[in-house]
Amino acid sequence: MTFRMILAFFTLCATSLFFGANQIEWSLLPTFNEKAWLPIIASRLPRLVALILTGSGLAMCGVILQHIVRNRFVEPGTTGSLDAAKLGILVSIVMLPSSDKLERMFFAVLFCFAAGLVYIAIIRKVKFSNTALVPVIGLMFGSVLSALAEFYAYQNNILQSMSGWLMGDFSKVVQEHYEIIFLILPITLLTYLYAHRFTVMGMGEDIASNLGISYAMTAALGLILVSITVAVTVVTVGAIHFVGLVIPNLVALKYGDHLKNTLPIVALGGASLLIFCDVISRVVLFPFEVPVGLTASAVGGVMFLAFLLKGAKA
């Protein structure tokens, strides 16, 4: 992990923390004036924490999925995970109208995990001559789930409730209304503890079995970790694309595939990218905000396209 990456991360954190539409009386901060500190403690600090956890969590989800499927072009957005989580939340709203975030997250995890199993079953069933078809199948699968979610929402007259999950938005993250996102912390720790198993799993089922690692159990664990992270993210801030696709590929290109060494870099890169996108979202139409999900899709898409073009020239 280079010094420049760490410096860039803390610079972005400081920018995110001290930049916003609400004016802060900077001269009163050293006196610990409650009114001056309120915007930072109640809104900007929770937002920054949510950005860091979401960015790092989604980037690590991308790594896990890429090792399970053994394809560089998959992430939660190209495997149907985000759409499955959205469908799960809608079902929870209809079945349990008074459900809280924890209950909605539980439904989202179940739907996410089930969608992951179905996607992997499809990938294992079909023989692909081109690896680019793997994410295409995922996008088609996600489109089916998204259509089901929209039909279900329309049927139950809750179509407007979907708007918050279609595009990630951190503007509503405030103190005492985002703490569920801290569940990503133990997920990150577990991912690192099982990094060696995920690395071996990425080499293939035969090699994993020869090295004494249960491919099925490791893949199931990976899907559970991904499902929880995606569910927590969608419930708290909404769906965010490309973070889990761009960062793992860039890190693997420069540092290799040994996850024990690269996971901290992946987490830092994911957090930095999402904070950068959030700052752009606040600057473009200041004092108004663009949803971070829209900015992340634009920035991530451009970065990944540049990555592909560079690889094609090489």
Curated annotation (Swiss-Prot):
Iron as a keyword?
yes
Q: Where in the cell is it found?
A: Cell inner membrane
Q: Which UniProt keywords apply?
A: Cell inner membrane, Cell membrane, Ion transport, Iron, Iron transport, Membrane, Plasmid, Transmembrane, Transmembrane helix, Transport
Q: Which GO terms describe its molecular function?
A: transmembrane transporter activity
Name the membrane topology term. Answer: Multi-pass membrane protein
The record, for CDD domains, names: TM_ABC_iron-siderophores_like
Q: Which GO terms describe its cellular component?
A: plasma membrane
The protein's superkingdom reads Bacteria
Transmembrane region positions? 1-21, 49-69, 76-96, 103-123, 132-152, 180-200, 207-226, 230-252, 265-285, 288-308
Transport as a keyword? Answer: yes
Any idea what a deletion of this gene does?
A: Mutants cannot transport ferric-anguibactin and are unable to grow under iron-limiting conditions.
Fetch the InterPro entries from UniProt.
ABC_BtuC-like, ABC_transptr_permease_BtuC
Q: Which GO terms describe its biological process?
A: siderophore-dependent iron import into cell
Chief location of this protein within or outside the cell: membrane
* Family (UniProt): Belongs to the binding-protein-dependent transport system permease family. FecCD subfamily.
Summarizing the function annotation, the protein's role is:
Involved in the uptake of iron in complex with the siderophore anguibactin. Responsible for the translocation of ferric-anguibactin across the cytoplasmic membrane.
Q: Share what the entry says about its subunit structure, partners included.
A: Part of an iron transport system composed of the outer membrane receptor FatA, the periplasmic binding protein FatB and the inner membrane proteins FatC and FatD.
Q: What is this protein called?
A: Ferric-anguibactin transport system permease protein FatD
Species of origin: Vibrio anguillarum (strain ATCC 68554 / 775) (Listonella anguillarum)
- What are the leading ranks of the lineage? Bacteria, Pseudomonadati, Pseudomonadota, Gammaproteobacteria, Vibrionales
